[in-house]
Amino acid sequence: MIELGVFLATPNLSDAEKQRISSWVDALSNHDTLHGPNEHYVAISYHISLFISRRCGNDRLFEMIRSMSRQTLRYSHLALRDTVRRDTSRKLWKNLSDFLAVRDAANASKIARELVDASGKSARMYLASSNQT
């Protein structure tokens, strides 16, 4: 769902909005954000995701994305608890921002899907390992 939101939002983003997204993505690289507790990193990622999705031009789709994002926020915290995983996420966000900058909706939406898939996989691995102890 998020990839559709990103795909539809890409042509709607103004230069100023793309710059704001880029600055938030840069904030993900901040040492304290990347290597400290994951709450700040997750909050920025969540904000970027909803900011982009809001520009999709479809209020119903945005509401579905927002609802799904709220429901999976706990799993995002689990998935991004590790600094190595946050660094991988940061690189994907940087790629997504770069594709948004040149209005490449296909690749931006592909990266959005990778972000969701990677977080889901990481959360599932964490939950599986915590159930074995």
Feature map (PLM): residue ranges:
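Active-site loop of classical SDR/Rossmann-like NAD(P)-dependent oxidoreductases
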Residues: 85-87
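Conserved amphipathic alpha-helical segments that form helical-bundle/coiled-coil interaction surfaces
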Residues: 14-78, 89-97, 102, 107-118
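Conserved segment of winged-helix/HTH DNA-binding domains
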Residues: 1-17
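Short alpha-helical functional segments enriched in proximate histidine and acidic residues
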Residues: 4, 8, 51, 122
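Short, charge-rich amphipathic alpha-helical segments embedded
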Residues: 115-132
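A glycine- and Lys/Arg-enriched "phosphate-lid" helix/loop adjacent to the NTP-binding pocket
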Residues: 82
